[in-house]
């Protein structure tokens, strides 16, 4: 499915920030349309810029896409050719995408660290291990704050790996990621955290602080979203065979995007804190939905191209990372 490779430009177009605050709700099953797209009444229509990034991110690594194919896909969502060409020009100018051959585009190299993070959703649970009760902690008091862009990137990196603030100078998450502190530190750096974080294992919290740490994540909200997302995927899977090809492409793009966003931003909490079986169920249903989505988009991609995942909408947004679903309000 589509990934949020739109992390590419941190100034004019900040796709990861857009990605992280998108919160579509499908509970009332009410949809409206634009072009062939069916999307929830609360959701925003797809923009030309984000559609370009989403489409390019589904292709095999470094595989270029002709502008004609992008224009055809845009028509499904009521986006005109001129709008797409303007979006392509702006994204290329901001180094979000690149082109070696006239009329063919692919994601830039700057997008790859986050793209790898998103591609991992089908196997995300392979990245967790049993929890020994300790936490990974990042000390933040010495970090420079004058560079707001760098500070935003650090915040996003921490949120992507499930960290939450335990105290004014301490971000924590359960120590249940494979590789422990060393691997987590490397992943933060790969996601743009600079300078290298002061990251360490935190043990033996007093009972009061331990309870406070466990309550940093809104687990009831997360579990409710697991159930809702699974139900949405199952309903859409049942509907898609009755849709036209264009409608199936558009619906799988929207519904799948919500599920992938949720999985990529999941804090991957251990079973001692959250219902991990419910999370696993969403991953499994999404794997099945991805196969359906790929089939719908096969004709668009062409017989010679094996999509890495079916295109899905990763959203457009302007909010800060604290909008990530499942974080306890403070």
Each model region followed by its residue ranges:
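Short, amphipathic alpha-helical interaction segments positioned at domain boundaries
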Residues: 114-135
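Short, hydrophobic-biased segments on the C-terminal half of alpha helices
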Residues: 85-89, 97, 155
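Mid-protein regulatory/catalytic core that forms ligand/cofactor-binding pockets
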Residues: 143-239
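C-terminal regulatory/effector modules of DNA-binding transcriptional regulators
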Residues: 210-330
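Minor-groove-contacting beta-hairpin "wing" of winged helix-turn-helix DNA-binding domains
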Residues: 103-108
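Short alpha-helical segments that sit at the start of domains
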Residues: 18-55
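Short acidic, hydrophobic short linear motifs in intrinsically disordered regions
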Residues: 63-73
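A short, conserved structural fragment
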Residues: 92-102
């Amino acid at each position: 499915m589509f990934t949020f490779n739109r992390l590419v430009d941190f100034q004019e177009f900040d796709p990861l920030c857009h990605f992280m605050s998108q919160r579509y709700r499908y509970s009332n099953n009410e949809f409206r349309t634009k072009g062939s797209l069916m999307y929830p009444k609360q959701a925003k229509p797809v923009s030309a810029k984000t559609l370009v990034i989403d489409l390019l991110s589904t292709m095999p690594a470094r595989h270029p896409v002709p502008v004609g194919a992008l224009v055809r896909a845009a028509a499904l969502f009521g986006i005109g050719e001129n709008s797409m060409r303007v979006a392509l020009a702006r994204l290329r100018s901001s180094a979000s995408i690149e082109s070696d051959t006239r009329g063919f585009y692919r994601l830039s190299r700057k997008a790859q660290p986050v793209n790898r993070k998103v591609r991992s959703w089908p196997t995300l649970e392979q990245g967790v291990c049993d929890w020994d009760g300790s936490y990974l902690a990042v000390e933040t008091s010495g970090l420079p704050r004058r560079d707001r862009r760098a500070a935003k990137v650090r915040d996003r990196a921490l949120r992507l790996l499930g960290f939450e603030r335990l105290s004014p100078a301490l971000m924590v998450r359960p120590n249940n990621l494979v590789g422990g502190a060393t691997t987590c530190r490397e992943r933060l750096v790969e996601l743009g955290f600079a300078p290298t974080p002061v990251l360490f294992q935190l043990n033996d919290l007093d009972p009061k602080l331990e309870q406070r740490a466990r309550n940093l994540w809104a687990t009831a909200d997360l579990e409710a979203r697991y159930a809702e997302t699974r139900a949405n995927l199952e309903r859409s899977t049942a509907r898609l065979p009755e849709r036209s090809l264009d409608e199936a492409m558009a619906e799988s793009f929207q519904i799948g995007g919500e599920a992938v966003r949720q999985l990529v931003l999941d804090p991957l909490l251990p079973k001692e804190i959250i219902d991990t079986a419910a999370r696993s169920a969403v991953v499994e249903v999404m794997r099945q939905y991805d196969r359906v989505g790929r089939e719908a988009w096969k004709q668009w991609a062409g017989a010679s191209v094996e999509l890495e995942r079916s295109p899905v909408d990763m959203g457009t947004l302007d909010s800060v990372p604290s909008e990530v679903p499942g974080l306890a309000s403070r």
